[in-house]
Amino acid sequence: MGRFISVSFGLLVVFLSLSGTGADFDCPSDWTAYDQHCYLAIGEPQNWYEAERFCTEQAKDGHLVSIQSREEGNFVAQLVSGFMHRSEIYVWIGLRDRREEQQCNPEWNDGSKIIYVNWKEGESKMCQGLTKWTNFHDWNNINCEDLYPFVCKFSAV
């Protein structure tokens, strides 16, 4: 009886510890879970607009990835580094400038607020991508028509 209680308690501890890590939801096959979101790294280069279109077609509320914290940025950098075996030096993210009357107006595609930024110093805020030279941590200004791999994201809750 004591062994049963010990094993049951151990399983309960494992379950409770996993439930706080996002293990309480499922992402589709090939997608990776992090902090109640699902992520998919795509190696097939697209321009920014086609990459965004692809992401919106993959899942409800799907978009090019928005990065809301340093921790999420580190996760995305690790995800990208794991699939980048080619020579591409940038990876699209879902941030771009929607200029209005010559004013910079950067916005995330998914409508989330910009609460964390990691722009490379001196960069303007047009279409943004992660750069290979900083292990995919810094955000760089890139011509929106250039072809690069990208990362999709959607909320799993």
UniProtKB/Swiss-Prot annotation:
Main subcellular location of this protein, as a coarse class: secreted
Its protein name is Snaclec EMS16 subunit alpha
Disulfide-bond pairs as recorded: 27-38, 55-152, 127-144
Can you provide one Gene Ontology molecular function annotated for this UniProt record?
A: toxin activity
Please describe the quaternary structure of this protein: Heterodimer of subunits A and B; disulfide-linked.
Keywords tagged on the record: Disulfide bond, Hemostasis impairing toxin, Platelet aggregation inhibiting toxin, Secreted, Signal, Toxin
Identify the stretch annotated as signal peptide in this record: 1-23
UniProt lists the family membership as follows: Belongs to the snaclec family.
Give the CC-aspect GO terms.
extracellular region
